[in-house]
From Swiss-Prot:
Molecular function terms from GO: small ribosomal subunit rRNA binding; structural constituent of ribosome
Family as reported in the entry's similarity comment: Belongs to the bacterial ribosomal protein bS18 family.
HAMAP family, per database record: Ribosomal_bS18 (MF_00270)
SUPFAM superfamilies xref list: Ribosomal protein S18
Superkingdom of origin organism: Bacteria
GO biological process: translation
Function: Binds as a heterodimer with protein bS6 to the central domain of the 16S rRNA, where it helps stabilize the platform of the 30S subunit.
Complex and partners: Part of the 30S ribosomal subunit. Forms a tight heterodimer with protein bS6.
Provenance organism: Lactococcus lactis subsp. cremoris (strain MG1363)
Name under which the protein is recorded: Small ribosomal subunit protein bS18
Listed InterPro entries: Ribosomal_bS18, Ribosomal_bS18_CS, Ribosomal_bS18_sf
This protein's UniProt keywords: Ribonucleoprotein, Ribosomal protein, RNA-binding, rRNA-binding
Length: 81
């Protein structure tokens, strides 16, 4: 039988960074913004991790993919060895 978890910790509410900073257009040339949504291995972080809304996540994903094709962002991270 599963036991109920008691006490624990309160989760931090994730805030949509794009909506909070009133960013209208997610531009593929703005690599500093896009790097917030990429893991250290170069993978696009999911909504449940970043806290972005579905609409803004689509904008971010499209901008990241465009930036990768234009060689502004890497497809994969460099090997650390």
């Amino acid at each position: 039988m599963a036991q109920q978890r008691r006490g624990g910790f309160k989760r931090r509410k994730k805030v949509d960074f794009i909506a909070a900073n009133k960013i209208e257009v997610v531009d593929y040339k703005d690599t500093e913004l896009l790097k917030r949504f990429i893991s250290e291995r170069g993978k696009i972080l999911p909504r449940r991790v970043t806290g972005t809304s579905a609409k803004n996540q689509r904008k971010v994903v499209n901008a990241i993919k465009r930036a990768r094709v234009m060689a502004l962002l890497p497809f994969v991270a460099e090997d650390q060895n």
